[in-house]
């Protein structure tokens, strides 16, 4: 028996050895256990089970006449009623499609017309632009020619021999000089000649003899009392030749009233001037013969009363009475009035 076993082993060893790659692998993969094979079978079965696609009918096909007359709001139940509803839907769709096509056609026509108009306008603007460019080039050339001619004329024009005197500019120095105060001694005042003024009215024609202590006299002192004399009449150079009686003769009450107050009657005198000067005191009643300049003294040297005796019309202050010094009702107590008449003696 042992011999048989040895023979068997030797026979097995004597068999040719098979490569390992030829040995079948007895393993189970996860793909073999999946359900992909079943899905493939179902996919293969589905196309066969699908219903054939509904064939769309051609446009313009005549529709059959519906067999029923179902109201619009009633639900279709029978096959004839359903066919009626289908025919109604087709008719509505055809009408809507026709309306849509017509609307699109009108819109397209409108757009085409606008396109044509814009093309024409664009063409016109291009032509206008070309014309303006040509005009601009022509004007630019003319401007260049004129500029060249002007430069040539300036170059050929000779320069003047003596340049124009430059006008003085406004500098702060000029303004400062204008602001400086000019003294009165440097201001020239024209002195008119005494021959130009020939007064026709003299104080001697107005003066009358009266009591000196009872009637006020004409004051020749200044309004401010600064000692400067302001005579009422311009005597000029005749002051040296006339007597002092003509100069210092006092005025009477009548003359005084006629000169400064006018007539005291109820009816106003038409010959009285606004400042109280009566026209009847003038020679011939002519106002033009009595210039106002005769009231002003243009002598450079003021006339003083130092050389005039007080007995000829200007009494001494000590001889005046206290009652005559008191001003009248309404008169100023501080200074004389504008006519140069003293409030008192």
From Swiss-Prot:
Its main location: nucleus. SUPFAM superfamilies: Leucine zipper domain. Residues 83-146 form the bZIP domain. It holds the Pfam family bZIP_2. Disulfide bonds: none annotated. Residues 30-40, 192-210 have a biased composition (Polar residues). GO terms for cellular component: nucleus. Induction: By the unfolded protein response pathway. Accumulation of unfolded proteins in the ER leads to splicing of the hacA precursor mRNA to produce the mature form. Keywords: Activator, DNA-binding, Nucleus, Transcription, Transcription regulation, Unfolded protein response. Residues 85-138 are annotated as: Basic motif. The keyword Iron-sulfur does not apply. Homodimer. Belongs to the bZIP family. This is Transcriptional activator hacA. It comes from Aspergillus oryzae (strain ATCC 42149 / RIB 40) (Yellow koji mold). The lineage of its organism: Eukaryota, Fungi, Dikarya, Ascomycota, Pezizomycotina.
């Amino acid at each position: 028996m042992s011999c048989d076993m040895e023979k068997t082993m030797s026979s097995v060893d004597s068999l040719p050895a098979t490569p390992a790659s030829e040995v079948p692998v007895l393993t189970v993969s996860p793909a073999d256990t999946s359900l992909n094979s079943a899905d493939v079978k179902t996919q293969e079965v589905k196309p066969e089970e699908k219903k054939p696609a509904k064939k769309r009918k051609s446009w313009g096909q005549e529709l059959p006449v519906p067999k029923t007359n179902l109201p619009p709001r009633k639900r279709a139940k029978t096959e004839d009623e359903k066919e009626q509803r289908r025919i109604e839907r087709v008719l509505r769709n055809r009408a809507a499609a026709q309306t849509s096509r017509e609307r699109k056609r009108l819109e397209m026509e409108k757009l085409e017309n606008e396109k044509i108009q814009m093309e024409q306008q664009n063409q016109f603007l291009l032509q206008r632009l070309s014309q303006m460019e040509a005009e601009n080039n022509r004007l630019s050339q003319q401007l260049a020619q004129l500029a060249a001619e002007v430069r040539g004329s300036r170059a050929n024009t000779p320069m003047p021999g003596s340049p124009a005197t430059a006008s003085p500019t406004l500098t702060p120095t000029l303004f400062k000089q204008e602001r400086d105060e000019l003294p009165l001694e440097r201001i020239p005042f024209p002195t008119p000649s005494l021959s130009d003024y020939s007064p026709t009215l003299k104080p001697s024609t107005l003066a009358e003899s009266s009591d000196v202590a009872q009637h006020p006299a004409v004051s020749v002192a200044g309004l401010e009392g600064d000692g400067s004399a302001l005579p009422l009449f311009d005597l000029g150079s005749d002051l040296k030749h006339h007597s002092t009686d003509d100069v210092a003769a006092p005025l009477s009450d009548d003359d005084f009233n006629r000169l400064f107050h006018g007539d005291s009657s109820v009816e106003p005198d038409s010959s009285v001037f606004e400042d109280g000067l009566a026209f009847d005191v003038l020679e011939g009643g002519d106002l033009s013969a009595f210039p106002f300049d005769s009231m002003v003294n243009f002598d450079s040297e003021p006339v003083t009363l130092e050389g005039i005796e007080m007995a000829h019309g200007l009494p001494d202050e000590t001889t005046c009475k206290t009652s005559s010094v008191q001003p009248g009702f309404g008169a100023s107590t501080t200074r004389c009035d504008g006519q140069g008449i003293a409030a008192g003696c």
